[in-house]
Amino acid sequence: MRECISVHVGQAGVQIGNACWELYCLEHGIQPDGQMPSDKTIGGGDDSFNTFFSETGAGKHVPRAVFVDLEPTVIDEVRTGTYRQLFHPEQLITGKEDAANNYARGHYTIGKELIDLVLDRIRKLADQCTGLQGFLIFHSFGGGTGSGFTSLLMERLSVDYGKKSKLEFSIYPAPQVSTAVVEPYNSILTTHTTLEHSDCAFMVDNEAIYDICRRNLDIERPTYTNLNRLIGQIVSSITASLRFDGALNVDLTEFQTNLVPYPRIHFPLATYAPVISAEKAYHEQLSVAEITNACFEPANQMVKCDPRHGKYMACCLLYRGDVVPKDVNAAIATIKTKRTIQFVDWCPTGFKVGINYQPPTVVPGGDLAKVQRAVCMLSNTTAIAEAWARLDHKFDLMYAKRAFVHWYVGEGMEEGEFSEAREDMAALEKDYEEVGMDSVEGEGEEEEGDEY
């Protein structure tokens, strides 16, 4: 078996975890108490969903997941919520005081008290696996736990499970909707620390999701529940190939092989279509061509950036539902002729396609319409460097005045860590710039200066 263990860190990670597991249960027909009427093999079996769920002798399905937060309130909602019987109590790990939006608390002071317990719980989950393929880690960049504790965990996982792949789903701080002033600090510190430990990181920009909810679903003031359900759909499309049998079954390492040309350039852009409310879906025929075309609209991306200004290094289209290869090939051919999709000159302009015949499921009472087919596009493009540039700029504005730095130093960090992290980010921006340069002509030219 190729099992995956999901780790949900901090408030954002836990709440997205709720949305994801709720959706997985609906997709696989698993009840909130873990029973699965359709599953005839008791205690194990070799079904595809066993990558995400383990089975007990009593026929109960338990998610291979750990929820961690340094303070209890958010996880208490899981402990008392609809799916409280689904999880093993030891899978829900809480500390007593939170990281207070401070990376240093999550990574050094508070985090170190909880890390061994978390790793022990992960080890127990890993022991139940016959062939663990890797970890999916859900967290935000901006929070103290999401940034600090995650980076600590990633470092330790690299030590304990060196060769296993680690994929991140990271919530990028939204420019408009900020929950903390120090988000740029936390984001840059965590990115710097986890850069060498993460194999592939799907960024989700809260603001982009807000806009999609407002524009496509006509929700005037989207709540986190609205956002998380949409994020859940995207995560579900990405992981569907691991949980169902499909024509092209992607395992975790295959994501990296197809999307990551260089180890540091591992931030694919996710785009999902169709995001549409029930009232509209009733009147629209969402063909393969239409939803494929929608994937190339910047409006449907999970991160605010413009791929029309960047170059693509790789592109995967993951379809689910009523889709046949013939339609897909036709849709891609049309897009290649119509759209100005620029690939880097050292990369073949191939689109990798995966098709899963399981149609998309929606949460009852949710905002999304039940559709026959959906597509999730994962593309590695140089345009995502815009997101780093925005963050770096905000970091610079605060760091120039050393604003709020004393909170970090007081928890045992050194100021040098800030400048080191910032230099690493500058190098990352430079890497993206160089990757997008043309290989032959680019040799003789002088490098143009940084845009700061």
Curated annotation (Swiss-Prot):
UniProt keywords, alphabetically: Acetylation, Cytoplasm, Cytoskeleton, GTP-binding, Hydrolase, Isopeptide bond, Magnesium, Metal-binding, Methylation, Microtubule, Nitration, Nucleotide-binding, Phosphoprotein
TM helices/strands, residue ranges: none
Enzyme class: hydrolase
Positions of post-translational N6-acetyllysine modification: K40
EC numbers: 3.6.5.-
Active site per database record: E254
Modified residues (3'-nitrotyrosine): Y282, Y452
Positions of the record's site feature: Involved in polymerization: Y452
Sites bearing Phosphoserine, chain numbering: S439
Keyword Cytoplasm tagged: yes
Annotated InterPro entries: Alpha_tubulin, Tub_FtsZ_C, Tubulin, Tubulin/FtsZ-like_C, Tubulin/FtsZ_2-layer-sand-dom, Tubulin/FtsZ_GTPase_sf, Tubulin_C, Tubulin_CS
PTM entry text: Some glutamate residues at the C-terminus are polyglycylated, resulting in polyglycine chains on the gamma-carboxyl group. Glycylation is mainly limited to tubulin incorporated into axonemes (cilia and flagella) whereas glutamylation is prevalent in neuronal cells, centrioles, axonemes, and the mitotic spindle. Both modifications can coexist on the same protein on adjacent residues, and lowering polyglycylation levels increases polyglutamylation, and reciprocally. Cilia and flagella glycylation is required for their stability and maintenance. Flagella glycylation controls sperm motility. Some glutamate residues at the C-terminus are polyglutamylated, resulting in polyglutamate chains on the gamma-carboxyl group. Polyglutamylation plays a key role in microtubule severing by spastin (SPAST). SPAST preferentially recognizes and acts on microtubules decorated with short polyglutamate tails: severing activity by SPAST increases as the number of glutamates per tubulin rises from one to eight, but decreases beyond this glutamylation threshold. Glutamylation is also involved in cilia motility.
Domain notes: The MREC motif may be critical for tubulin autoregulation.
Stated role: Tubulin is the major constituent of microtubules, a cylinder consisting of laterally associated linear protofilaments composed of alpha- and beta-tubulin heterodimers. Microtubules grow by the addition of GTP-tubulin dimers to the microtubule end, where a stabilizing cap forms. Below the cap, tubulin dimers are in GDP-bound state, owing to GTPase activity of alpha-tubulin.
Protein name in the entry: Tubulin alpha-1D chain
The species this protein was found in: Bos taurus
